[in-house]
Amino acid sequence: MSSSEVNKVFTEEQEALVVKAWAVMKKNSAELGLQFFLKIFEIAPSAKNLFSYLKDSPVPLEQNPKLKPHATTVFVMTCESAVQLRKAGKATVKESDLKRIGAIHFKTGVVNEHFEVTRFALLETIKEAVPEMWSPEMKNAWGVAYDQLVAAIKFEMKPSST
């Protein structure tokens, strides 16, 4: 990802599209979060190995007691960050959380391809959640917001200082 991609301006129109979609999705964020992660694992089954509680679990993914809460947290954080992007001018995740997220992603071996799969899965999840609103403009808005969040996470991807 080039620095010009990361520093793309998030326009008022993009913000409006993201806010409108999130208003609809928010009430169903737990289910959508789970769908989002199931899509990731469908596209890249090996991504399960990045999660200690999934690696050797005999429990089906959709029944794993730890997956849904984690998926919900990630989905909500991603969407809330997108909604706040224009106002804040950057991804809005607490710095301490970003450092922790970056360190975990570094430690577990997350690479660029994982972020690409996650981007695709996120956009597909949103497209399916709000099909009547979906458009190339909305896809682009969510893509720009996701790219900003990923850039912030990648910046913090280094060994934990704790």
From Swiss-Prot:
Q: What is the free-text note on the cofactor?
A: Binds 1 heme group per subunit.
Record keyword Nucleus present: yes
UniProt keywords (A-Z) are: Acetylation, Cytoplasm, Heme, Iron, Metal-binding, Nitrogen fixation, Nucleus, Oxidoreductase, Oxygen transport, Transport
The protein's annotated catalytic reaction(s) are:
Fe(III)-heme b-[protein] + nitric oxide + H2O = Fe(II)-heme b-[protein] + nitrite + 2 H(+)
In which tissues does this protein get expressed? Answer: Root nodules.
Instruction: Note the effect listed for residue 31 to D.
Output: In 30 percent hemoglobin I and in hemoglobin II
Matching PROSITE patterns: GLOBIN, PLANT_GLOBIN
Q: What class of enzyme is it?
A: oxidoreductase
The Gene Ontology terms for molecular function here are: heme binding; metal ion binding; oxidoreductase activity; oxygen binding; oxygen carrier activity
Q: Where in the cell is it found?
A: Cytoplasm; Nucleus
User: Which InterPro entries does this chain map to?
Assistant: Globin (IPR000971), Globin-like_sf (IPR009050), Globin/Proto (IPR012292), Leghaemoglobin-like (IPR001032), Leghaemoglobin_Fe_BS (IPR019824)
Q: Which cofactor does it need?
A: heme b
Q: Where is this site: Homodimerization?
A: 139
Where heme b is bound, by residue?
A: 52, 66, 70, 100, 105
Q: Where is the Globin domain?
A: 9-158
Main location per UniProt? cytoplasm
Q: Does the keyword Signal apply?
A: no
Query: What EC identifiers does the entry list?
Result: 1.7.2.-
Q: Where is this motif: Homodimerization?
A: 42-46, 112-124
Question: What CDD domains does the record tag this protein with?
Answer: class1_nsHb-like
Q: Which GO terms describe its cellular component?
A: cytoplasm; nucleus
Q: What does this protein do?
A: Phytoglobin that reduces nitrite to nitric oxide (NO) under anoxic conditions (e.g. during flooding or in waterlogged soil) and upon root nodulation. Required for general plant development and during nodulation, especially for the onset of symbiosis. Monitors nitric oxide (NO) levels during early phase of the nitrogen-fixing symbiosis and buffers oxygen in functioning nodules. May not function as an oxygen storage or transport protein. Has an unusually high affinity for O(2) through a hexacoordinate heme iron because of a very low dissociation constant.
Q: Which family does it belong to?
A: Belongs to the plant globin family.
Q: How does it assemble?
A: Homodimer with distinct heme coordination in each subunits.
Q: Which PANTHER family match?
A: LEGHEMOGLOBIN-RELATED, NON-SYMBIOTIC HEMOGLOBIN 1
Protein name per its UniProtKB record: Anaerobic nitrite reductase
**Protein encoded by which gene:** HB
